[in-house]
């Protein structure tokens, strides 16, 4: 899972995560086999750290979101991305969450299954007709719903779903009935840990799995994150909410690539891209640039146009500009504007160089503005 990132600047997060949680995260990412990763205590930690490595690399390019959302565990990544949680708190909460869910899975054994090709309301009918402990756990996309509960309950609801017209019912290799009342003990255990982390208010809202609404007040997340464990993930509704808020471009960060397909199925005309490895960063830069438009902004009756772009530092260190790059120089996507130490400063945008903001020899910090561009 993590091998492509070895040697990349963002790999430093792996060492930080190991120090925080007292586990060898590098070994988990590089040496753990598929069977061991089925253990939710391993899967959640490795997925979270992997996603944060991708996020860190993307932030070094100066690319920032308007909204964030994450599916299940991914909600912790989204909250860390917006600054609601620090990286330290994110790691600690993910470890606590995984352990709580593992224990709940032992005390209340259960399973999950994906129901394909059946409307949401019919899947809900199937769960009710099963007359057993089974519920909808994930509303992923149109015709893609996950159910969870007791082994007998999931089997019974799956059979009813097929009778109602489901194209396929696929058992999932999981260690519990997540996002159902079977996780009540985990929910109660996690609530205090989240409150103790004191999530912060954020400028960038996060769309909650529980209610599919945008939230940026830190004090709301103790109840939302804990409730998420025993409530269905309303992912389809989160996507619809973002679309209604004007989002047209969706970037999936981290291993898997599954959410990109869900966005395409749910939002007509959505632009999507998935980024999981360093090799895909250049592709992301090109994708972002292809979607750049001059967006009119209403300011006191006048139309201004959002064409200004800042290129930021990918790392801390001493800045050295490219010698022949001057004001008025035409910049393409990926053009090298200079170096910060050994790290190249590449422009994620096309445009015309207006000025360098950092001067030669200046010691800069990560994400400090380096240059100012005006988009073509």
Give a label for each model feature:
Residues 59, 162, 240-246:
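Non-catalytic positions within long, well-ordered alpha-helices that form the structural scaffold/packing
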Residues 271-294:
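Short, flexible loop segments at boundaries between secondary-structure elements
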Residues 296-355:
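Acidic, low-complexity mobile loops and tails
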Residues 18-23, 33, 82-230:
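Alpha/beta catalytic cores of group-transfer enzymes, especially the acyltransferase/condensing modules
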Residues 74, 326-339, 360-370:
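Short, well-structured beta-strand-loop connectors
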Residues 1-123, 168, 172, 249-278:
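FabD-like malonyl-/acyl-CoA
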Residues 138, 321-323, 339, 355, ...:
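A residue-level detector for short acidic-glycine micro-motifs
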